[in-house]
A protein has these predicted regions:
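Active-site-adjacent structural elements that line small-molecule/cofactor binding pockets in enzymes
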Residues: 1-295
Length: 295
């Protein structure tokens, strides 16, 4: 039996208190299972935003998607995680990554290490969080045991190894970092993503419990005119054709029926049962979710 679908929305736009609560309630009404906050300069501070999201809603879980480990001291992060889990009634999911925007580190006056150094820092952070939050002497205490569910966003070999060892949720962006590109990331095609997921499964083969697999959908649009929606992407990725863009795993553009079929195919081919969309796609993807409930 395939794992049931879960759907999350990453609420990337800051908002005043009443507007923030209203959009969290709207996401709950639309059927989202997880309300998420990013960790970028210019976005909301994740933990207070998630506590407010939990207070405004009753059903969805809340989570970071994903924290930049380079912004955080592990001991201070453990305090934030435990407090947020307690204040949300045990609804928190912790998403971690290495960060990929050098300019944000420079703005914050924080060192920007090599890729290997950033992975090492993330590994130390995960291990220290497990030690601190697993200790009965740690104050404050999280609600969830043995720990708050951990999501790690990964693509490279070392990150996939770390994810296989530690994460309850393995998150794939279906993109890779490329210095000098317009966004810092370029999308992965289906064959490249096949290889990344296959490597993760190999590295995770000895796990007692299989992890949930997550995919971040970068573009979602219910439309009869895919070319109009995808034109900006074609401008950002030289050499990418409309046909290739339409087939990218992280791009869902087409009619509602086509997108429902695409989401089912993502789970069948790659194992992605937990799908996350960005806030601008929240309403559009809700149309697709309606065709997948109970699947």
């Amino acid at each position: 039996m395939p794992r049931p679908f879960r759907f999350g929305v990453n609420l990337v736009e800051p908002a005043p208190a009443a507007e923030w609560r209203a959009k969290c309630r709207r996401a709950e009404e639309l059927g989202y299972d997880v309300l998420l906050a990013p960790d970028h300069l210019g976005s909301v501070a994740p933990f207070p935003a998630l506590v407010a999201a939990a207070e405004a809603t009753s059903r969805p879980r809340v989570g970071t998607f994903v924290l930049n480990a380079g912004f955080w001291n592990p001991a201070l992060l453990a305090r934030e995680v435990a407090t947020a889990d307690a204040l949300t009634g045990g609804r928190l999911e912790l998403g971690l990554g290495t960060g990929y925007v050098q300019q944000e580190h420079e703005q914050a006056g924080l060192p920007w290490g090599s890729p290997g150094e950033r992975v090492d820092h993330l590994r130390r952070t995960v291990e220290e969080l497990d030690r601190l939050l697993g200790s009965p002497e740690h104050r404050p205490q999280a609600v969830q045991r043995p720990r708050v569910p951990l999501l790690i966003g990964a693509n490279g070999d070392r990150m996939l190894r770390l994810t296989a060892r530690h994460a309850d949720i393995a998150a794939f962006t279906a993109a890779r970092s490329v210095p000098g590109s317009a966004t810092g990331l370029v999308p992965l095609g289906a064959e490249e993503l096949d290889e990344r997921v296959a490597l993760y499964r190999e590295l995770a083969a000895d796990r007692a419990e299989p992890a949930e697999l997550n995919l971040l959908l970068q573009i979602v649009a219910v439309t009869d005119d895919p070319a109009a929606v995808l034109e900006p992407l074609l401008e950002h990725v030289p050499g990418l054709t409309l046909e290739q863009a339409s087939a990218l795993p992280a791009v869902l553009v087409g009619t509602r029926e086509q997108l429902v079929a695409r989401v089912r195919a993502l789970r069948e081919r790659f194992g992605f049962s937990y799908l996350t969309v960005l806030e601008p796609s929240m309403e559009a993807f809700a149309e697709v979710m309606a065709g997948l409930r109970g699947a």
